[in-house]
Amino acid sequence: MYTTPAPPEITRRSSEPSTQQGTLGSLEGEKGHLLFPGFVVLVTIFLVVIVTCILWSRKKQKKRRVPYLQVTPSLALPPPRQRAKNIYDFLPRQQTELGRHQLSGFSTESLLSRASDSPEPEVPQASGSLQKHRASVHAVEYTVGVYDNGTVAQMCGPLASSAHRVCDGTSRNNSISSKESNDYVNIPTAEDTSETLTCTKSTPESHLGLPSGQRLEFAEGGHAGCGKATDRTGVWAPGLQGSNSLSEGDDSSQSSNDYVNMTGLDLEDIQESRPRVAFQCCRDYENVPPVVANGSQLQTVEEVTSSTTDRGEPAQRTLPSVYHMAFRPSAWSEDGAMIPGEEASNGDSSDYENVLVPELEGKDWKQGPGTWHPSDERTPSDQAGKFCEAVYPAGSLATETSGEEV
């Protein structure tokens, strides 16, 4: 059969919608391919950010934990032991003290409790030593005190009226003393007690060490002013120039000026070489101004025995204590008077001060073993190395005689 061809306008209209459908499908496919990779990229970026944040936070936490290490207690360690109970705390006080001495082991609590409950053992020992010293002092019967120059005037009274005195024997023995102390009392040893008691009964004179070279002369009862010059009670403290009777060492003081040790002192040699001069016992050594000696101002203390008088025995009464001064005459005039202005000083002692020697014209002087009188035939040069003595009344020196002078 024979067909007829279609016109060209109809063929063009039918082909246009098919091409339009093909383009729309291709466009949708391309859009789907483009959205998937973009979404994947966004997800990966987000994950990376999250991971970096986590790592940064962990680093900060690690840095903070390094200086502060936290020690976690382990549960495997055993629990601490309980302290042992002190069974003696429940006992009475006496049983507690007895039980604590029997402990083989100790703890800090027991040591603290012992220290608080234990009494101090030093107190009874100190009291016992004081009682021993008191007992020894009362056995010898002399008072213990501190030597002081200001109390010398107060000491003169009780020394003059004392019935028990320390004799010459105790001064020759060693004394218990301290070489570096300025205030102390010489206490004789136990071996000297028997000799001290016997000497006080047998000998009429006794010697006591007084500070800084003082010498006290005092009379007691009816013995005052009677007898020879050697029967007087007196004390001579060394310290004058040229004294060799003391030995170097323990017999003398090396660093003190308030006392004089009488150990190793031979008083007889000192009395023979150095006569004594009496002064009123009031203060320490002072300057004595020159006195114009006359009958009322200068009085001699004469000791006259029974063989020097025919009418009666004269008796004298002096004050209980006087000063003693020894000086050396330096120059004499032809008529028997000492040249004024001469001074006698002591080179070895720092406690003495220079004393002016008074005039001797027509005055009575107490002659000692080494004195020189104007009536003597010897010259003053023979007596240059010896001492002379004089009596100076201080205040009122009462001298009474019960008989007429020859």
From Swiss-Prot:
One of its GO terms (cellular component) is membrane. It is a single-pass type III membrane protein. Residues 55-406 are cytoplasmic. It comes from the Eukaryota. GO terms for molecular function: protein kinase binding; SH2 domain binding. Signal peptide: none annotated. Residues 242-258 have a biased composition (Low complexity). Disulfide bonds: none annotated. GO terms for biological process: adaptive immune response; antigen receptor-mediated signaling pathway; B cell activation; immune response; intracellular signal transduction; lymphocyte activation; negative regulation of MAPK cascade; negative regulation of T cell activation. Keywords: Adaptive immunity, Cell membrane, Immunity, Membrane, Phosphoprotein, Signal-anchor, Transmembrane, Transmembrane helix. Residues 1-25, 109-131, 219-258, 358-406 are annotated as: Disordered. Pfam families: LAX (PF15681). Phosphorylated on tyrosines upon TCR or BCR activation; which leads to the recruitment of GRB2, PIK3R1 and GRAP2. It is found in: Cell membrane. The modification Phosphotyrosine is found at Y184, Y259, Y285, Y352. Residues 1-33 are extracellular. The chain crosses the membrane at residues 34-54. When phosphorylated, interacts with GRB2, PIK3R1 and GRAP2. PANTHER family: LYMPHOCYTE TRANSMEMBRANE ADAPTER 1. Negatively regulates TCR (T-cell antigen receptor)-mediated signaling in T-cells and BCR (B-cell antigen receptor)-mediated signaling in B-cells. This is Lymphocyte transmembrane adapter 1. It comes from Rattus norvegicus. The gene is Lax1.
